[in-house]
Amino acid sequence: MTKCYVEQDGSRFLLSCDGHAGDVEACNFMTGIVYALAGYVHNAQTEDHAEIFAYETDKARGRFLLHFTGDERTEAAFETAVIGLQMLERERPACIHIDYGEENT
């Protein structure tokens, strides 16, 4: 199972995922979402719309971490990624679990 943690505090965003989903389709779905978000935020940073504080990936451990700040467009990208992960959690609860920081409850 992949355990994700989502936190938003104003214009600061954190998404971390740990562990393997145990299902190839679920893993591919999550990978697409988190890498799309990371790519968007990286591009936003080059255009001075975001700043990445931490970015880590470890395929062997199934680890992803992205901590950043940004404008309303990066916020929309973050929220879209979280919605995608929530959809997967509803459809395949044995593959992913999401915990939320206080600002997200």
Protein language model regions, located:
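N-terminal intrinsically disordered, cationic/polar leader segments
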Residues: M1-E25, V34-T105
